[in-house]
């Protein structure tokens, strides 16, 4: 994948970059795998904002992506590599030998015409899905399950990957993109390879309007608010907030740990790097 730059025809265009979409092979998605997406504006069923800075954005359809990879021992041919507006990664349309069609996350170097397989005895090549017990140590993997049969939940963003570090008892130790080393059951499925679209992190948004196209609303600073709205609000003229940085609800921010101990904490062998 390449990054496309623009001539500085305006202030917003000057630093803007965009994907060249070289790997995309079709512009129209598979209609049988589309769902309508309803916008929430970050509101819950009471109409109250539960997720700030969400709203607007381009209308889009949801693509049903197969994270489970539960069609075991049935080969599938890659029919196309497509754009998905709901995620940073590209998706690949698979045509299975029994006639079914499904989308999967497109790994790096997966091409149209390739054959992929989900099996305990599949080859170790990008796009193939296997249980962790059947994958050699040191292999680069993505789309990793945390619960058997639930579907992949880890390492799904563009360019991300995890690495299988060790196997001990009924658990495998997997190094995640954050640097965390975590124990995962050996019977959980994972897909071989790195998620594609690796240059996604190098894209520059360039202007505020492009963030709005993505459904992201502006983030207002606390010091620019009134005292009723934020602990940093108020004061005559410009102020620094007058206290250590806090959230709108008074919880310290900038490094303060808010994660509570939970049952799954015992599966973390090494915490994520700072």
Curated annotation (Swiss-Prot):
SUPFAM superfamilies registered for this protein in UniProt: Nucleic acid-binding proteins, Translation proteins SH3-like domain
Recorded GO CC terms: large ribosomal subunit
Pfam family, one: Ribosomal_L2_C
Keyword DNA damage assigned: no
One GO term (biological process): cytoplasmic translation
SMART domains: Ribosomal_L2 (SM01383), Ribosomal_L2_C (SM01382)
Keywords from the UniProt entry: Ribonucleoprotein, Ribosomal protein, RNA-binding, rRNA-binding
Source superkingdom: Bacteria
InterPro entries: NA-bd_OB-fold, Rib_uL2_dom2, Ribosomal_uL2, Ribosomal_uL2_bac/org-type, Ribosomal_uL2_C, Ribosomal_uL2_CS, Ribosomal_uL2_dom3, Ribosomal_uL2_RNA-bd_dom
The keyword Lipid biosynthesis belongs to this UniProt entry's keyword annotation: no
Chain residue ranges for the region called Disordered: 223-255
Subunit structure: Part of the 50S ribosomal subunit. Forms a bridge to the 30S subunit in the 70S ribosome.
Reported function: One of the primary rRNA binding proteins. Required for association of the 30S and 50S subunits to form the 70S ribosome, for tRNA binding and peptide bond formation. It has been suggested to have peptidyltransferase activity; this is somewhat controversial. Makes several contacts with the 16S rRNA in the 70S ribosome.
Record family assignment: Belongs to the universal ribosomal protein uL2 family.
Entry protein name: Large ribosomal subunit protein uL2
UniProt source species: Geobacter metallireducens (strain ATCC 53774 / DSM 7210 / GS-15)
Gene giving rise to this polypeptide: rplB
């Amino acid at each position: 994948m390449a990054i496309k730059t623009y001539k500085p025809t305006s202030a917003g265009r000057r630093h803007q970059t965009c994907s060249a979409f070289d790997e995309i092979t079709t512009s129209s998605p598979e209609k049988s795998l589309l769902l309508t997406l309803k916008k929430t504006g970050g509101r819950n069923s009471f109409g109250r904002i539960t997720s700030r800075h969400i709203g607007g954005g381009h209308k889009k359809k949801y693509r049903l992506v197969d994270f489970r990879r539960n069609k075991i021992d049935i080969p599938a041919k890659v029919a196309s590599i497509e754009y998905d507006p709901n995620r940073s990664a590209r998706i690949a349309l698979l045509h299975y030998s029994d006639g079914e069609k499904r989308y999967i996350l497109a790994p790096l170097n997966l091409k149209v015409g390739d054959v992929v397989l989900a099996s305990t005895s599949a080859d170790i090549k990008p796009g193939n899905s296997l249980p962790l017990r059947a994958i050699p140590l040191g292999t680069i993997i993505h789309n990793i399950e945390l619960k058997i049969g639930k579907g992949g939940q880890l390492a799904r963003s563009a360019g991300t990957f995890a690495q299988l570090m060790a196997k001990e008892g009924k658990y495998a130790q997997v190094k995640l993109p954050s640097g965390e080393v975590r124990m995962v059951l050996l019977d959980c499925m994972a897909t071989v390879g790195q998620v594609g679209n690796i240059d996604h992190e190098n894209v520059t948004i360039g202007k505020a309007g492009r963030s709005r196209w993505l459904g992201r609303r502006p983030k207002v600073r606390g010091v620019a608010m009134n005292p009723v709205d934020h602990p940093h609000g108020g004061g005559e003229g410009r102020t620094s907030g007058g206290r250590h940085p806090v959230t709108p609800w008074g919880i310290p921010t900038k490094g303060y740990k808010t994660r509570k101990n939970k049952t799954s904490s015992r599966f973390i062998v090494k915490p994520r790097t700072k």
